[in-house]
Swiss-Prot record:
GO terms for cellular component: cytoplasm; cytosol; endoplasmic reticulum; extracellular region; membrane; mitochondrion; nucleoplasm; nucleus. The gene is OAS1. It is found in: Cytoplasm; Mitochondrion; Nucleus; Microsome. Its cofactor is Mg(2+). Its EC number is 2.7.7.84. Changing residue 332 to A: Loss of activity. The lineage of its organism: Eukaryota, Metazoa, Chordata, Craniata, Vertebrata. This is 2'-5'-oligoadenylate synthase 1. Residues 13-60, 200-210 are annotated as: Interaction with dsRNA. Changing residue 109 to Y: In IMD100; results in increased 2'-5'-oligoadenylate synthetase activity leading to increased RNase L-mediated cellular RNA degradation, translational arrest and apoptosis. Produced as a latent enzyme which is activated by dsRNA generated during the course of viral infection. The dsRNA activator must be at least 15 nucleotides long, and no modification of the 2'-hydroxyl group is tolerated. ssRNA or dsDNA do not act as activators.
Amino acid sequence: MMDLRNTPAKSLDKFIEDYLLPDTCFRMQINHAIDIICGFLKERCFRGSSYPVCVSKVVKGGSSGKGTTLRGRSDADLVVFLSPLTTFQDQLNRRGEFIQEIRRQLEACQRERAFSVKFEVQAPRWGNPRALSFVLSSLQLGEGVEFDVLPAFDALGQLTGGYKPNPQIYVKLIEECTDLQKEGEFSTCFTELQRDFLKQRPTKLKSLIRLVKHWYQNCKKKLGKLPPQYALELLTVYAWERGSMKTHFNTAQGFRTVLELVINYQQLCIYWTKYYDFKNPIIEKYLRRQLTKPRPVILDPADPTGNLGGGDPKGWRQLAQEAEAWLNYPCFKNWDGSPVSSWILLAESNSADDETDDPRRYQKYGYIGTHEYPHFSHRPSTLQAASTPQAEEDWTCTIL
């Protein structure tokens, strides 16, 4: 693979296409592996349980679910929504027993040779794991596929297009998280909303997210522990929403804008109101508290208890220093050696929520309030043509 830092700015789209986009064969392999595990969860896993267990749905999460998988990253997150889990506390208290049962059944299938595949179950790292991790391999798969299966409480039920959760779901989440002191612990319950947050985004924005993720992973190899990758994905969405909003844009400019946001991490206060807002008094009070926390504040658009920016000032400082160094590399230089410009980010919000409360009082760098995605402009940018379109998938396995 060509070194990203030495890739000319004008060639970043080609770099993404040549090295980061998963090819059709790779996607087919991953989907085949997912079908095997989904079938197992549906038909076999809880068939002999001592009490009824209904799997209401299995949802593909993580990068695979969002459509931002990097080439060569053979992993998949499957969130299994189970009927016995009726509260967030149930999920916390009982997920271990369901993980143990899934593991037991996988190992039984392995002994019985029920599948033409091999499961290599990973030992949990702590006593109450959030996920069962294993590797699935077969002759049909070119390489092993790493799985994380996460039991979850079905807080949302069946979703429809344009779904916005009943505020009482978030009231319940806030109250239980506060009582348990487990803020951000139940983001898996909102996997579908996290996926849908990116689902309708332009293909090229997803390519920019892939580029930022590739940069982040290079930094992580060098620096070690860093803020969560999801925070960088959200920063990329924020940069595009406030600086471009076009389906075709200059990739180097977008990339530089994201790195400048990282450099200015101590000024970041970013959140969205697509799924929750300030209209309910309990949610409003909680959001006010979240938004006055030390910067950076980057709230999960699907889960107001999840602050992706908090808890790792050292990691942000290291990442910012690395970003500053990167701005001097060829990937941010024009053909004449001048630096690529970044997007000018709009600082004002047109959110209807401003009538109820003035969230901009919390703003240092930015605020996002989105209810509906706008109609994207299809006018090509004069700066740079779009890369080859990618096939996108929306994947939910609903168990009837």
